[in-house]
Regions:
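Tandem CBS (Cystathionine beta-synthase) repeat/Bateman regulatory domains
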Residues: 1-300
Length: 300
């Protein structure tokens, strides 16, 4: 990842500075089973699918795999049966602003990156990559909270983003005894990446992600089993008043994509903060760089 001079503005950043250079490609005739294995091995959320000539023809994400699980497709089915076409591209020389706008307009979470000269695929750009760049930008800044450049609390002259300002305020929980099919229906309906699982008292006791569902599919778990049998626990949470910079650090260290947000009591879940939420604010973690936010349309 590029070393960023703190004098730069986010508006001047390019796709090549944020993109991930490792692109995992699989032939369209490979099985869903094999695709899940590769996704888990490389800790990625999607695969670029190619034909026998090596040409990019589609994308298979964990959402597509969840759909196959729900539909009861044999796990030996080829990836071409569930891939989404066509894959969407941007160029390595494009501005990050333009790429983010393309992702927003297309309703996608990633773009594949092409070299404008040769036309080769040279990388992939997703929201976590953008957050990584923003986090690096903040960490190098003289105003960084984590660098100790300013004091916290009332003595801090810089107004900083908190989790409350960035999180998604609505949280849809599902009961411990609901089936995986119900979990998948809810994830699909609300376009969530994970579901909070609650016990008989309505208290959070676990999380089911699309990764958990993909593994259940691969292991032949009946989708009618109860959510509690495959959920992950404990629930990773943070306080609603936590600084955004601290929350991103927590997700980075734990290698997770979301934190459920509590207010005062960890059992009182009031929202969820994802890396996607953090990327969509188009700025760093405080108002010191608010003037350098990437411009978007007024309706965004």
């Amino acid at each position: 990842m590029a070393q960023i001079n703190r004098k730069n503005t986010l508006r001047n950043l390019g796709v090549s500075e944020a993109m991930r250079r490792q692109v995992i490609q699989l032939d369209q005739v490979k099985s869903i089973d094999h695709g899940i294995t590769v996704l888990i091995k490389y800790k990625i959320n999607a695969l670029l699918i190619v034909d026998s000539r090596g040409q990019s023809v589609g994308v298979v994400s964990k959402t597509d795999i969840m759909g196959a699980y729900y539909a009861g497709l044999p796990i030996e089915s080829p990836l071409e049966h569930i891939m989404v076409t066509p894959p969407l591209f941007c160029y390595s020389g494009d501005s990050l602003e333009a790429a983010l706008e393309q992702m927003r307009e297309s309703g996608v979470y990633r773009l594949y990156v092409m070299d404008k000269g040769e036309g080769d695929i040279v990388g992939a750009l997703a929201y976590p990559d953008i957050v990584g760049l923003l986090y690096q930008y903040c960490h190098q800044c003289e105003y960084s909270h984590l660098q100790g450049g300013t004091r916290s609390g009332q003595d801090d002259p810089v107004r900083r983003f908190t989790v409350r300002e960035v999180m998604t305020a609505s949280v849809k929980g599902i009961g411990l005894n609901e089936t995986l099919n119900t979990v998948m229906e809810t994830l699909s309906a609300y376009r969530f990446g994970a579901m909070l699982v609650t016990d008989a008292k309505g208290l959070p006791c676990g999380v089911i992600s699309k990764t958990d569902l993909a593994l259940s599919y691969r292991h032949g778990v009946d989708p009618e089993v109860e959510a509690g049998t495959v959920m992950s626990s404990p629930v990773s949470t943070c306080d609603v008043g936590l600084l955004l910079e601290e929350a991103i650090k927590k997700m980075t260290i734990a290698d997770i994509h979301r934190l459920f947000v509590h207010k005062v009591n960890p059992d009182n879940i009031v929202g969820v903060l994802s890396l996607t939420d953090a990327a969509r604010i188009r700025s760093g973690s405080c108002y010191a760089c608010v003037s350098s936010r990437i411009k978007v349309n007024d309706h965004d």
